[in-house]
Amino acid sequence: MLVRIPQVLNAEQLAMLREQLDHAGDAWVDGRVTAGYSGAPVKFNQQIDERSEAAAQCQHLVLSALERNPLFISAVLPNIVYPPMFNRYSEGMTFGLHVDGGVRLHPHNGRKLRTDVSATLFLSDPASYDGGELQIEDTYGVHSVKLAAGDMVVYPSTSLHQVKPITRGVRVGCFFWIQSLIRDDGQRALLFDMDNAIQTLNQTNADERARRTLVGCYHNLLRQWSDT
């Protein structure tokens, strides 16, 4: 399930984040330092050092925004969110086809985190750079994603994906992974559809008993499928 989440960051938050990143200096390092065995040969970008003060401040801003975003919570059903990371692609940089690693170590507590959902939060105006599309492959084909600054896309971490080469300008972004309460993408998609239906019914004069029944089905499925 691929879901676009608009305006995760408002203009003020976006400006604060870009101010931090644009003046991060030596905190920008070779992106291959965090790449796995298969990803390193095709990864050519820069990342903010996860241990830097710039990373900590930017992570706090993004995580605070996610906690207040109902669409993110509904679509992802987050259990554990990996601390957001930040990357930069300048002219000629790219990240070839790869699948994200299935398990990562949380940098703050060392615990293992299963990567169920991948997220990319766009931080650059799409008119400021050419190329840099996030291409995600699934059974329906190839989806090319290039969103407005502040918008985010989430998709199954099982997906083969790539960032196309930059031919002009600079693309700055935020990326991270989520261990969901529901590890199966099909089950998450079903619960997401049910939640959307419930929210629609809440805004109408739908039969209250029928609405309560649907809410009960949602929570009983969540209880049955949840890993926690």
From Swiss-Prot:
Q: How is the cofactor bound?
A: Binds 1 Fe(2+) ion per subunit.
Cofactor names: Fe(2+); L-ascorbate
Which Enzyme Commission number(s) are on file for it?
Answer: 1.14.11.-
Residues forming the Fe2OG dioxygenase domain are 80-180
Q: Name one GO biological process term.
A: intracellular iron ion homeostasis
Q: Does the keyword DNA damage apply?
A: no
Q: Its domain of life?
A: Bacteria
Residues reported to bind Fe cation: H98, D100, H161
Keywords from the UniProt entry: Dioxygenase, Iron, Metal-binding, Oxidoreductase, Vitamin C
For this UniProt entry, the molecular function terms from Gene Ontology, in alphabetical order, are: 2-oxoglutarate-dependent dioxygenase activity; iron ion binding; L-ascorbic acid binding
**PROSITE patterns reported in the protein's UniProt record:** FE2OG_OXY
HAMAP family named among the record's database cross-references = Hydroxyl_YbiX
Name the UniProt record assigns to this protein: PKHD-type hydroxylase Rmet_3078
What organism does this protein naturally occur in? Answer: Cupriavidus metallidurans (strain ATCC 43123 / DSM 2839 / NBRC 102507 / CH34)
